[in-house]
Amino acid sequence: MKKQEGEMTFLDHLEVFRWHLIKSILAIVIMAVLAFVFKNFIFDTIIIAPRNPEFWTNRMLCKLAELLNTATLCINQHPFKLVSPELAGQFTIHITISLLAGLILASPYVLYQFWTFIAPALYQKERKYARTTILISSALFFIGITFGYFLIAPFTIFFLGSYSVSHQVENYISLMSYISTLASVVLAGGIAFELPVIVYFLSVLGIITPTFMVKYRRHSIIVILIVAAVIS
């Protein structure tokens, strides 16, 4: 830790942390309020969109289906109806999604506040590695959730929404169930793309070695294929 940081007392650090925390909470609240106001964009354009025929992925797959002369790829052309079986269901979901959206939208600012708090305690070399790690991790996570949202989610929604064990059983899909499934799929994509960073840190800590990875590469390929099959 740098000398000037060593001169600060515990209460001084606590006061600095308190202000960073207050700023982060205010940012989350402001973003949550904006998300609450723009509910049509949040729900219609982002959350519910993957089940609609007009969604980008669904349109592209239909065009590909026309070129290949097969209707199999043309998915989500008859979207299922979403229901809210509880009286306060839609309002509760609106509040919950607004808070989550606020946290997501404010996350860059929250990370910045966290960084400005810990950065003075790091040496220049440590700052460089930390910045690089944060940037790479953030980029991979963003790519992962984009992949999950635009590619995995439409197929998952189509498969689960149209799956039937009997023609006598009709799907009764709640809005909360739909959102939960969509969030799980998108988050899984983000976490999956973080694997290179996780493997790197495990390698640095000596938990995973190059010899270990070479020895069990075939096993890892099988596991990846199984997980990919389950997700897709």
Cite the ranges covered by each PLM segment.
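Membrane topogenic/interface segments and analogous intrinsically disordered interaction regions
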Residues: 1-232
